[in-house]
């Protein structure tokens, strides 16, 4: 289903190295011509220092098995440059005792003072570490790169011209080494930096757009990600505005997160509003499924869209791991919505709405009742499901109120900040004539 594939869009907002997992994922699908896809991977990997990956891709394209002369020369140059950079940071590597001291590492000034006192540390060593980290990353040695990037974050001042690059590099390296806990910490650190930096409006919008795309990789792989993606994308006005302005296709991932997060059903109402607002700029089976179900109450349409959703998710690298969960929770949403309208339902009717056989539908409902997720009774003789009342719990009501107030508070804070900046700018402009 190439018409709903987002890889070509998502890759525009990802670092070159972060695109490789997405492109390799597509190689296992029948969406695009395999030859053209491998040729694109080869052209992309040539722009890095990943010589082995380049040779592997050439073999997959049935090109010459022997390493071309330019690659032989590039490999020699890479090894020589690595050796030179490693020699430049050698004084830092002698400071292993300090690097292992957690208390010293917590305080940047104490750490730098100890390095200067005991190891004759100079700022030139810091920039050598930065260059080595970047070079290791370009070579695909992400794990080793993170060590030097971490060192740079501790020593480097936030005002340093390379500080933002280090934040981005650290996040990318942690994602590529699948260190999701650390990646989440780096994501939070980077978001705080972007939100508090003195960027122009356009620069801030661009930075947030990139961060949104990178964060999807983290959120769908971290245990807390399903809550955090909703908080960031739906309830932080600056990021919701970035999605609506620059990347409405991210609605797919926000919608998926809400569907598979049963504890955040209160977010559905706010999500549906945004989906309706953005329906003229972006639609796909996942957003249309929610529209069919909660706006039009079109159960037949929702059933058909759910079938399309499975194909979309199966071919989307970001959310493919959520496929079974999505189908299960989407069926539950259809069932719950249908039950709000009908107090008594035949199992055959329900099976039709859920794309299931009658005996499968009956077993599915029995499991829901057994797991205390459904207040209902089954009349096996008549083949009916009789619903009980399902009031919203006090906890769910409280969470819904808190989310609503939080969103309004952030919106007001953003409005006040913008007005304050505008007022200060007007004050500055008024002095230009004196």
Curated annotation (Swiss-Prot):
Keyword flag Cytoplasm: yes
Instruction: Name the Pfam families for this protein.
Output: eIF3_N, PCI
Quote the subcellular location field of this record.
Answer: Cytoplasm
Annotated TM spans: none
GO cellular component terms, A-Z: eukaryotic 43S preinitiation complex; eukaryotic 48S preinitiation complex; eukaryotic translation initiation factor 3 complex, eIF3e
Main function:
Component of the eukaryotic translation initiation factor 3 (eIF-3) complex, which is involved in protein synthesis of a specialized repertoire of mRNAs and, together with other initiation factors, stimulates binding of mRNA and methionyl-tRNAi to the 40S ribosome. The eIF-3 complex specifically targets and initiates translation of a subset of mRNAs involved in cell proliferation.
What the entry lists under PANTHER family is as follows: EUKARYOTIC TRANSLATION INITIATION FACTOR 3 SUBUNIT E
Family, per the entry? Belongs to the eIF-3 subunit E family.
Question: Could you tell me what this protein is called?
Answer: Eukaryotic translation initiation factor 3 subunit E-1
Q: Could you tell me which species this protein originates from?
A: Drosophila willistoni
């Amino acid at each position: 289903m190439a018409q709903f594939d987002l890889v070509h869009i998502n890759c525009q907002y990802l670092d070159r190295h972060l695109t490789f997992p997405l492109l390799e994922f597509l190689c296992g699908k029948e969406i695009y011509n395999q030859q053209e896809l491998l040729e694109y991977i080869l052209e992309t990997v040539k722009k890095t220092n990943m010589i082995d990956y380049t040779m592997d891709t050439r073999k997959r394209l049935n090109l010459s098995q022997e390493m071309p002369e330019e690659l032989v020369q590039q490999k020699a140059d890479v090894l020589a440059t690595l050796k030179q950079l490693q020699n430049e940071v050698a004084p830092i590597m002698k400071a292993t005792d300090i690097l292992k001291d957690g208390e010293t590492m917590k305080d940047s000034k104490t750490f730098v003072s100890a390095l200067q006192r005991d190891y004759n540390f100079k700022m030139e060593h810091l920039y050598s570490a930065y260059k080595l980290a970047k070079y290791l990353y370009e070579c695909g040695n992400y794990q080793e790169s993170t060590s030097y990037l971490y060192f740079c974050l501790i020593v480097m001042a936030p005002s340093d011209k390379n500080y933002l690059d280090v934040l981005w590099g650290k996040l990318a390296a942690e994602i590529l080494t699948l260190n999701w806990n650390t990646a989440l910490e780096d994501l939070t650190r980077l978001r705080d930096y972007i939100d508090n930096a003195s960027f122009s409006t356009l620069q801030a919008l661009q930075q947030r757009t990139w961060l949104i795309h990178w964060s999807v990789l983290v959120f769908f792989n971290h245990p807390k990600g399903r809550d955090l993606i909703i908080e960031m994308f739906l309830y932080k006005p600056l990021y919701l505005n970035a999605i609506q302005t620059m990347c409405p296709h991210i609605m797919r991932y926000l919608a998926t997160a809400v569907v598979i997060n049963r504890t955040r059903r209160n977010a559905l109402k706010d999500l549906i509003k945004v989906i309706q607002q953005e329906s003229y700029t972006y639609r796909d089976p996942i957003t249309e499924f929610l529209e069919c179900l909660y706006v039009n109450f079109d159960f037949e349409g929702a059933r058909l869209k759910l079938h399309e959703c499975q194909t979309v998710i199966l071919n989307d690298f970001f959310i493919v791991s959520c496929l079974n969960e999505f189908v299960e929770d989407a069926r539950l949403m259809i069932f719950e919505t249908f039950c709000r309208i009908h107090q008594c339902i035949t199992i055959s009717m329900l099976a039709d709405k859920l794309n299931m056989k009658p005996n499968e539908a009956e077993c599915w409902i029995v499991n829901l009742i057994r797991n205390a997720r459904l207040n209902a009774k089954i009349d096996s003789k008549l083949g009916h499901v009789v619903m009980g009342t399902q009031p919203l719990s006090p906890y769910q009501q409280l969470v819904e109120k808190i989310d609503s107030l939080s969103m309004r508070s952030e919106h007001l804070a953003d409005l006040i900040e913008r007005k304050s900046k505008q007022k200060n700018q007007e004050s500055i402009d008024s002095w230009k004539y004196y």
